[in-house]
Every structure is written in structure tokens, then in C-alpha cells.
């Protein structure tokens, strides 16, 4: 589609009370994991989306949810829609217990598809 935009939405749990640096690190983990998933997937469509996203400047938006249930819902919807998505659990080395779900990423993918899942969320 000509002129189509691509982006990645990163969703971070606010209910955990993570410090700014911790939240930023979790967002980065989610972003990177989604890209690694695409590179390892062998799915040509996802690879094309990744390349277009890269060429367009790697647009990202960081959004918030207030609960684990909301985070799981975002991730599940992305997977159901066939979009690349990651789900991050903390290693437990600093502020959180090991295995605590902290963040997810949807995309990179066409913005219109990402927005179907994350369009109602607020900025982090």
C-alpha cells in the first residue's frame, strides 16, 4: 500500500510502580524481542514490515496499561491478529520478583493494524 506508515507500540504496566529507568529498560526489552521474533520467524510479510519500519525511521509509541490482565489482553489480541508481538517477564535482579510480566510490544507492523489493538491506550 503506497504511503502506508509502520510503527511499533510498546505497552508497559504502570501498576508495578517501576522507576523510570526500570520502565525504560523493560520497554527496550519488549521492542528488541519483537524485532528478534521477526528475524527468527521466517515470515516474509513480517520481514517486509520490519524493513519498511526501519526505512521510515522506526516509529515507536510507549503506552500504558494498569494491570497484568490488560497487558495479556493486548498481547493476545496481537497474536490472534497475526502481528509480531513480544511479552516480557522481568529477570528479577532489581525491583521486581523474577518472572513478573512487565511489558509487551506490538509490531513493527502497518500502523493501521497496530492501532486496532493499541489505539485506545494512553501514553505512558
UniProtKB/Swiss-Prot annotation:
One of its GO terms (biological process) is translation. InterPro entries: Pep_tRNA_hydro_II_dom_sf, Pept_tRNA_hydro_arch, PTH2. Keywords: Cytoplasm, Hydrolase. Its main location: cytoplasm. GO terms for cellular component: cytosol. It is found in: Cytoplasm. It catalyses: an N-acyl-L-alpha-aminoacyl-tRNA + H2O = an N-acyl-L-amino acid + a tRNA + H(+). Pfam families: PTH2. Gene3D superfamilies: Bit1. CDD domains: PTH2. Its EC number is 3.1.1.29. GO terms for molecular function: peptidyl-tRNA hydrolase activity. It is an enzyme of class 3 (hydrolase). The natural substrate for this enzyme may be peptidyl-tRNAs which drop off the ribosome during protein synthesis. Belongs to the PTH2 family. This is Peptidyl-tRNA hydrolase. It comes from Aeropyrum pernix (strain ATCC 700893 / DSM 11879 / JCM 9820 / NBRC 100138 / K1).
